[in-house]
UniProtKB/Swiss-Prot annotation:
The keyword Repeat applies. The gene is Nfkbie. Serine phosphorylated; followed by proteasome-dependent degradation. This is NF-kappa-B inhibitor epsilon. Residues 93-104 have a biased composition (Pro residues). Belongs to the NF-kappa-B inhibitor family. It comes from the Eukaryota. It comes from Mus musculus (Mouse).
């Protein structure tokens, strides 16, 4: 678990390569001279090694999860700030056709190159900003001109443009980034991949793009998508979807190879344990029908039936017993589910028991 708990400051250099070197290699032109005290070049475009003037700084915005989903970049319209990037074909917000060749770097003017290699004080590249400000013309211009490595640059919160596109519910942008080879396994400051974010926000459309789209021919796939990858809380995507009680999202993950019995990293709970804790019987039934192991054990030896019995969840206990749960398994404290149960009759998978001709009534 030591690896799963690493914070962003402790992450391996190989994992946290921001791609800055790619920007430096792209920007091989001599630096234009600016007037003393000026924050921009003579062309009027911001220089990539300077931050936006403080006088124009906008307050940061946060999304529903408390994550920063905006930038301190000066203008609310990137197309006004970077007019040199406007192209006739960039007016069309649809992504470039798959397999289209990348334009040679020589077609860029020095001013356009400065704009494309801009980095804000928050570590946001122009690609981050295009996602934040919903500027599709700038976004697809970046996708056409920038090398693949630049797509994976992480800002100061370790977010890639792909993270932000999911945060801001932009499935078309997510699809375009995946087609261009953006990494889907990079983790932000919480250890979340873009798919973790999609599961937490219950964004089925973005999750579909991340799971089902593949890079176009000629694009390098550096690392395959790992559905068992855990964030710093020890949660895989399936755990998050289960806690959100989102059955369509759970089904999508399972169809694409998620391990239904993967254990979270703190106490060893599986999705079935978490479903019991949500106290939603239909979710427990769904996971059992999908093949969840009914007697999966936590690190302390508890099965889902231990949890249901200890919480007095009689209907869920009955469902687990009907699926074959063993009510006599011991945990590390030598307790069985029967020891924890308030009502042993809840374990019996029958509803027509009679004593001396009188029915036994079991209530939840």
């Amino acid at each position: 678990m030591s690896d799963a708990r690493k914070g962003p400051d402790e992450a391996d250099d190989s994992q946290c390569d921001s791609g800055i070197e790619s920007l430096r290699s792209l920007r091989s032109l001599p630096e234009p001279t600016a007037a003393p005290g000026s924050g921009s070049s003579q062309s009027g475009c911001p220089q990539p090694w300077r931050h936006a003037p403080e006088t124009h700084k906008e307050p940061e915005k946060e999304d529903a999860d408390g994550e920063r989903a905006d930038s301190t970049y000066a203008s609310s319209s990137l197309t006004e700030s970077f007019p040199l990037l406007e192209r006739p074909e960039a007016k069309d917000p649809s992504p470039p056709a798959p397999g289209s060749p990348l334009p040679p770097a020589g077609v860029l003017s020095p001013q356009q190159l400065e704009a494309l290699t801009y980095i804000s004080e928050d570590g946001d590249t122009l690609l981050h900003l295009a996602v934040i400000h919903e500027a599709p013309s700038v976004l697809f211009c970046c996708l056409a001109f920038l090398p693949q490595e630049v797509l994976d640059i992480q800002n100061n919160l370790y977010q890639t443009a792909l993270h932000l596109a999911v945060h801001l519910d932009q499935p078309d942008v997510v699809r375009a980034l995946v087609l261009k080879g953006a990494s889907r396994i990079l983790q932000d400051q919480h250890g979340d991949t873009a798919l973790h974010v999609a599961c937490r926000r219950q964004n089925l459309a973005c999750a579909c793009c991340l799971l089902e789209e593949q890079p176009e021919p000629g694009r390098q796939l550096s690392h395959p998508l790992d559905l068992q990858l855990k964030n710093w809380q020890g949660l895989a995507c399936l755990h998050i979807a289960t806690l959100q009680r989102n059955q369509p999202l759970i089904e999508l993950l399972l169809q694409n190879g998620a391990d239904i019995d993967v254990q979270e990293g703190t106490s060893g709970k599986t999705a079935l344990h978490l479903a019991v804790e949500t106290q939603e019987r239909s979710l427990v039934q769904f996971l059992l029908q999908a093949g969840a192991r009914v007697d999966a054990r936590m690190l302390n030896g508890c099965t889902p039936l231990h949890l249901a019995a200890g919480r007095g969840l009689n209907s869920i206990s009955s469902t687990l017993c009907e699926a074959g749960a063993d009510s006599l398994l011991l945990n590390v404290e030598d307790e069985t589910p029967q020891d924890l149960a308030e009502d042993l009759l809840s374990y019996l998978p029958f509803d027509d028991l009679k004593i001396s001709g009188k029915p036994l009534l079991c209530t939840d």
